[in-house]
Amino acid sequence: MSNIAFYVVSDVHGYIFPTDFTSRNQYQPMGLLLANHVIEQDRRQYDQSFKIDNGDFLQGSPFCNYLIAHSGSSQLLVDFYNRMAFDFGTLGNHEFNYGLPYLKDTLRRLNYPVLCANIYENDSTLTDNGVKYFQVGDQTVGVIGLTTQFIPHWEQPEHIQSLTFHSAFEILQQYLPEMKRHADIIVVCYHGGFEKDLESGTPTEVLTGENEGYAMLEAFSKDIDIFITGHQHRQIAERFKQTAVIQPGTRGTTVGKVVLSTDEYENVSVESCELLPVIDDSTFTIDEDDQHLRKQLEDWLDYEITTLPYDMTINHAFEARVAPHPFTNFMNYAFLEKSGADVACTALFDSASGFKQVVTMRDVINNYPFPNTFKVLAVSGAKLKEAIERSAEYFDVKNDEVSVSADFLEPKPQHFNYDIWWRKLYHSCWKTKGTTCEQYDDTRSRS
């Protein structure tokens, strides 16, 4: 009997160092350097193993913002990935946020194949690799890379104007027969998540096609040995029938691990499926060059941008969503001043800390880690009312206590989908889902 180990990280978002950079010289058990150390320590027990990145590696952290601001190149990020010797990866939706030339340059620099079978540029796959086969002893491992098809709903049109996005389900259905003919082991590497509960099959979200994981498992699990997922930042390690299912969280806080065993008759089975915690280790060190790079990054983050008239610190994010707060008022006011729009709304991310009086680059990036631009839209009153009522569904009230609705907590927290509104709007009762709005004039209004 022989074993093959598969180690997976996903949604690292450029968090290389063991810190989220909320403060200088902070240390946390996270990041690609420490996650890779965990992998290298564990893989010693196996003769054969794979190291996999499941996408969203190029954007979403202070380090990624630093690279685009200072050099316009991902070379320093690529250097980390190349020296860690990944075997293959796939594309995430955030890979497109800096534009197609930046992504293509990154792909040229990486020393491992990035697989994506369902995104096309003209008549060929964007990465020139959709499926790849690896020979491991007498076994052939076939891997297909897939990415959520929902990218056009988020991305700036000029970043993806030459691309076509296909359903991951449909492309997998197309490729599987050929993969079965050529491979003994089939691995699906999907930067997308699950639209239904894995046990009950009950939908956990509106079925838009953004996440097709459950549909693929339900239809094809008998042909898939390992089903790798991401995008939702969930931590999943379980079996769907005989298929190992992995989703290893985000920012390098956990590592997905699957071990397949092959018996003397070449029958393949799942030996184990688990998440390895990324924890501090006395043998883990950061070399001098990496420490120097981190210092440069910390200095850039501490650059003072401006001084405000008063403190806008957020001590409790939920309270800032329930009642007017100087930070969200400031942001919405700035949007209106810049755009000339009639109405503005913004969201608070989980990392939001507001602004101290002296605002640094660190403060800006901690509040909005993804450098997205605001959007100006023309909408009807009916659509605006519908959007406000959707925001109202964020809240639940029991015994006169306001809390967050379970719909925004399961299967993953979605606080970023609650919009905080500004200007003459409507005031919506938050007691029950489906409550309608009544006219309400208040420049500090909440939905």
Task: Describe these PLM feature segments.
Residues L33, Q75, P101, E170, ...:
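Generic alpha-helical secondary structure signal
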Residues T262-T360, N367:
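A short C-terminal boundary segment appended to hydrolase-like catalytic domains
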Residues D87, L91, Q156, T229, ...:
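Generic preference for well-ordered secondary structure
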Residues T140, H316-E319, T432-K433:
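Short, solvent-exposed loop/turn motifs
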Residues L126-F134, Y190-K196, N267-T285, D302, ...:
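Amphipathic, soluble alpha/beta structural segments
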Residues M1-S282, V322-A334, A344:
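Acidic, metal/ion-coordinating pockets
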Residues N3-A5, Y15, Q28-M30, L34, ...:
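Feature captures C-terminal
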Residues K51, K104, K132, K180, ...:
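Context-gated lysine
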